[in-house]
Each structure stands twice: as structure tokens, then as C-alpha cells.
């Protein structure tokens, strides 16, 4: 059984971020960002996270799953103030769910991460209300409810 968590790194210092990962005994961090090197926090860059997790968070493993990130086009649309999706987040959620069903390899999530007890989904948003990791978590629970339980937002 996978305990699934969510975390965003913005508004957290490196000390806070890695402290949370360590305190919650996270075995594997799954990065679900489209651009894992384009963020403001240097500690969250793709090439640095595996080292920091290994050294500062009890050997936590790192895996980038770009197929679970919203596409560039979908992100552009939700950020464009003139698009309906930017005003109604449910439209984004529906489009992202469709993307996960048709263009991702979501079906192998349990197979790939089932060897870990505590897994966290990472993206940049500080909370998950308007973040794709919440939608992804919900979908994983719907698809794999016997193999995954939601542990919470970190």
C-alpha cells in the first residue's frame, strides 16, 4: 500500500522542505513538473534534488515523471486571462484528466512506485487547491484505491 502525499516547494526554505520530507519518512519524491529546472528555488532543480534528498532526507529517491505534468499548451491556456479555463479551474481539471487518460503512462504508477511505502508528488504551487498534483492524486486514488491511500498535503 502506497501512502501518497503532495508537496509544493514555493514559500518554503530548503531547510523547511527537506525537513518535511525527512520528518514524514518519504521514500520517493515524484516530480510532476513540466519544467523541473525553471523554478525560483535552486534546491528544487532536477539535477540537484536527487543529491539533496539522498543526503538530507534519509536517502529519499527522486523520479521525474513529465508525462504526469500538464502539457505546455494546457498550462499556457490556464494562465491566459482571456481564456475561459483561467476563470473556471474545473475546465482545467477536466482537460488535465483527459490528458492523463490519453497521453500519460498513469497506468504504471503502482507498478513503478509500489515498492515504496511513502511517496510524495512534487510541484511548485504552495497549496494544492489550484494545482494539478491534487487532480493527479484524486485520479490515482480513483484508479488504484486498493493500492494507494492519501496521506495528506505536506
Where are these regions (language model features)?
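Residues lining hydrophobic/aromatic ligand-binding pockets adjacent to catalytic sites
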Residues: 1-154
